[in-house]
UniProtKB/Swiss-Prot annotation:
Protein name, UniProt field: Adenylosuccinate synthetase
Keywords: Cytoplasm, GTP-binding, Ligase, Magnesium, Metal-binding, Nucleotide-binding, Purine biosynthesis
Taxonomic path: Eukaryota, Sar, Alveolata, Apicomplexa, Aconoidasida
Note: Parasitic protozoa lack the de novo purine biosynthesis pathway and rely exclusively on the salvage pathway for their purine nucleotide requirements.
Class of this enzyme: ligase
Species name: Theileria annulata
């Protein structure tokens, strides 16, 4: 029996929401919905490469760099030190919200330790993604310069936002980094590079004053809020399977997208008590290249893509779609430790006579499922290794995805429009069974069921109700 751990509006002071797949799980809907109960919403990773699409009071909003809490009046919003900032894009996003009547004056704070995304970073990213031939390193990024920015960060040559508070020093740092990056990547001629540098210096000189008042020690700010017992919300970008260390490497993003990334990304102590919420879409999607064991290429793909409106907010690319992969979800749960789950877009599956869930992988040749903990072993270059992965294990290397295929559990569909249903108990029994099977497989209580069209069904321990 799965423990029914529920979100307590009174006692759960610190909340974290993070994606359990390759991003695009629908995190923004729950963040926006719950943010009204919180004093501060902080984002701990990513940059303007991610995208959130939300509806609030009938108006559609598209966010990239900013936390979803910006849509909630009086809520403070933080971009932590784990976020990378492209100044022009951020200002454009702020101006766009202002035109829609949302003023972020005195509501947005940005870490002085956040690294800057330069236009040259974006040019390098675009160059890498356009490479052709045998030695191409293309992985399907958004071409927003996030990878090159984090690369310079790791090389200790990047520039933090706080450096702009001392213009003379910033000018030296930007000049040095620009010529160094171009020397390494050979993107521009010397004359074009000089023009780019002058243009970028002018942009920063003109625009930084617009957000200078927002730049501060956000780590101290968040720590202070937590100590004072205020309600703080942590928002992650992307999804756990895109994590640099634990995702489907190298087809990953360049930051830590897992729950553990919140500590470094915001500068808070691991001792802080956090209710961790995992967001899981009722089926699987992915943008860009990389392994996707349950990917569909038939009419079922067309149905999922069309009815789920699976188009990337940032790039406009059509998302790849497939059945829900519970093996990957269990893998993510193992290192994330989510207390509760928010299941999204359940209504998109209403069109199917039957639905499938991947519960295991089997070898394409031998047909053996991934559950062998004992021999047979085999040798490779005098090294012994297991021929089969044990049950519940997710492959570590991309080549392993080519050797295995999904094992599905088929469940009857519900063929009923559930978009207007207001309680979990109103859902067709087959839909309820689908939710309960996921819950039992993962061993985590599904506290919210989000419908793509309208509602969020909220499951209490004894009663099930809808939050409007």
């Amino acid at each position: 029996m799965v423990e029914r751990r529920c979100y307590d509006k009174v006692n759960d002071k610190v909340l974290l929401i993070s994606g359990m797949q390759w991003g695009d799980e629908g995190k923004g809907k729950l963040v926006t919905h719950l943010s009204k109960d919180f004093d501060l919403v902080a984002r701990y990773n990513g940059g303007h490469n991610s995208g959130h699409e939300m509806y609030l009071d009938g108006v559609k909003y598209k966010l990239h760099s900013l936390p979803c809490g910006v849509l909630v009046p009086n809520t403070l919003n933080v971009l932590g030190n784990g976020v990378v900032v492209h100044l022009e894009s951020l200002l454009s996003e702020i101006d766009g919200l202002l035109k829609l009547g949302i003023d972020l004056t005195n509501r947005l704070f940005i870490s002085e330790r956040a690294h800057l995304v330069l236009d040259l970073h974006i040019a390098i990213d675009s160059q890498l993604e356009s490479e052709q031939g045998e030695y191409s390193t293309t992985i399907g990024t958004t071409k927003r310069g996030i990878g090159p920015t984090n690369s310079t960060k790791c090389k200790r040559t990047g520039i933090q936002l706080g450096e702009l508070l001392n213009w003379d020093n910033f000018e030296k740092l930007l000049t040095k980094l620009t010529y160094k990056l171009n020397h390494e990547n050979k993107v521009f001629s010397n004359s074009d590079l000089a023009d780019l540098l002058n243009k970028e210096l002018e942009i920063y000189k003109t625009n930084f004053s617009k957000i200078a008042h927002c730049v501060c020690d956000t780590s101290y700010m968040i720590q202070k809020y937590i100590k004072e017992g205020k309600k703080v919300f942590f928002e992650g970008a992307n999804g756990a399977l895109l994590d640099l260390a634990l995702g489907t490497y190298p087809y990953v993003t360049s930051s830590n997208t897992t729950t553990s990334g919140v500590y470094n990304g915001l500068g808070i102590s691991p001792s802080v008590k956090i209710l961790k919420v995992g967001v899981l879409k009722a089926y699987q999607t992915r943008i860009g290249q990389g392994p996707f064991p349950t990917e569909l290429f038939d009419d079922n793909y067309v149905k999922l893509q069309k009815h789920g409106s699976e188009v990337g907010v940032t790039t406009g690319r059509t998302r790849r779609c497939g059945w829900l992969d519970l093996v990957s979800a269990k893998y993510v749960q193992g290192f994330s430790g989510f207390d509760v789950i928010n299941l999204t877009k359940l209504d998109v599956l209403s069109q199917f006579d039957e639905v499938k869930l991947c519960t295991n992988y089997k070898h394409k040749v031998t047909g053996t499922t991934l559950k062998n903990l004992l021999p047979p072993f085999r040798y490779l270059h005098n090294t012994i290794y297991r021929e089969f992965l044990e049950e519940g294990r997710y492959p570590n290397c991309c080549y392993q995805f080519d050797e295995y295929e999904p094992v599905y559990k088929t469940m009857p569909g519900w063929k009923t429009d559930i978009s207007d249903f207001k309680t979990f108990e109103q859902l067709p029994q087959n839909a309820q069974n689908y939710v309960l099977f996921i819950e039992e497989y993962l061993g985590v209580f599904i506290h919210w069921v989000c419908l793509f069209i309208n509602n969020i069904t909220f499951r209490w321990e004894l009663a099930k109700m809808l939050i409007k």
